[in-house]
Amino acid sequence: MLKVRKDDEVVVLAGKDKGKRGKVLKVLREDSRVLVEKVNMIKRHVRPDRMGKAGGIVEKEAPIHVSNVAIFNAATGGGDRIGYKVLEDGQKVRVFKSNGEVIGRR
């Protein structure tokens, strides 16, 4: 089970972009990877197509393993681990392990 969701703000813990923050654009559950905005950028060579769209070198985000990111906790100013808690009304929510604060309910 992945505890990271789309639109979460995360911090990169390991790799060439260690320390960078960004928003999760997409969660790839089957690979346990996430696409993070402006993190792990790669260059791809694109051919021009028949409709006149120009080719060239395009920079885009590559997936990063979920174990290399942590959700950003504004209260502590860094990455934090996540747990789950059931509220009185029976709703299951994500909470930060360090301070027990509820993470953005939907």
UniProtKB/Swiss-Prot annotation:
Name the protein family: Belongs to the universal ribosomal protein uL24 family.
User: What organism, scientifically named, is this protein from?
Assistant: Acidithiobacillus ferrooxidans (strain ATCC 23270 / DSM 14882 / CIP 104768 / NCIMB 8455)
Q: What interactions and quaternary structure are annotated?
A: Part of the 50S ribosomal subunit.
User: What keywords are annotated for this sequence in UniProt?
Assistant: Ribonucleoprotein, Ribosomal protein, RNA-binding, rRNA-binding
Which InterPro entries does its entry note?
KOW, Rib_uL2_dom2, Ribosomal_uL24, Ribosomal_uL24_CS, Ribosomal_uL24_KOW, Translation_prot_SH3-like_sf
Question: What Gene Ontology molecular-function terms does this entry list?
Answer: rRNA binding; structural constituent of ribosome
**Which terms in the GO cellular component ontology are assigned?**
ribonucleoprotein complex; ribosome
Q: Does this UniProt record's set of keywords contain Repeat?
A: no
| Lineage of the species this protein comes from | Bacteria, Pseudomonadati, Pseudomonadota, Acidithiobacillia, Acidithiobacillales
The UniProt entry, under NCBIfam families, shows: rplX_bact
Does the record carry Ribosomal protein as a key word? yes
> PROSITE patterns, from UniProt?
RIBOSOMAL_L24 (PS01108)
Q: What is this protein called?
A: Large ribosomal subunit protein uL24
The biological processes this protein is annotated with in GO are: translation
Task: Describe the function of this protein.
Answer: One of two assembly initiator proteins, it binds directly to the 5'-end of the 23S rRNA, where it nucleates assembly of the 50S subunit.
Cited HAMAP family: Ribosomal_uL24_B (MF_01326_B)
